[in-house]
Amino acid sequence: MCASALQVGLYAQQATKLSPKLSPKVMAVVNAPLVELKDDDPSLLRLEKERFNAALKEAKARFDLHNRGLTRIPELIAVSERLFGAEVDLYDKPERKAEVLQRQLDVYIEAEANLQKQVSDGLATQADLERLRFNKFSVEIDLSNAKNRHGDHESKAQPTP
């Protein structure tokens, strides 16, 4: 049992040395504050806020585990999907949704470059990189759709001459 614990400790130390520092955009997401719950929040909004806060707490915990070499990249990708998805659901206005999606896309673009380097260095798998790329393309599609809906909404709101 002691040998097993020692092996886990050594693995964590080695993984920590190999784990690259998180990018500024990722750190901004991880360091974001929890959303304040208000007594007069409608029940659905309250649930959406609680879900976002749970996702943010999980993200903070998973990134802490990553920094200690105790979690894998797919878990970080999955938690980021949940976190950004929960944040998008907090907003009704298409332009606010688009802002969140743009931030998510910016994080994924930065993460893709970092992950590509890790794959080249043998520290991550090609499968992890392709999963991130799939998610990035999905966000690009969602962002394009959100911008098109926002543009359609604005053009319909404009009076005709």
Regions found by a protein language model. Name each.
Residues 125, 152-157:
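Short, solvent-exposed, mixed-charge loop/turn linkers that connect secondary-structure elements
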Residues 14-24:
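Compositionally biased, intrinsically disordered low-complexity segments enriched
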Residues 23-37, 80-85:
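Short, charge-rich amphipathic alpha-helices with coiled-coil/heptad character
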Residues 44-84, 97-139:
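Charged, solvent-exposed structural "stalk/scaffold" segments
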Residues 1-12:
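Sec-dependent N-terminal signal peptides
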Residues 31-49, 87-99:
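Short, charge/polar-rich alpha-helical segments
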Residues 159-161:
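Short, solvent-exposed mixed-charge patches
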Residues 84-98, 137-153:
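Amphipathic alpha-helical coiled-coil segments
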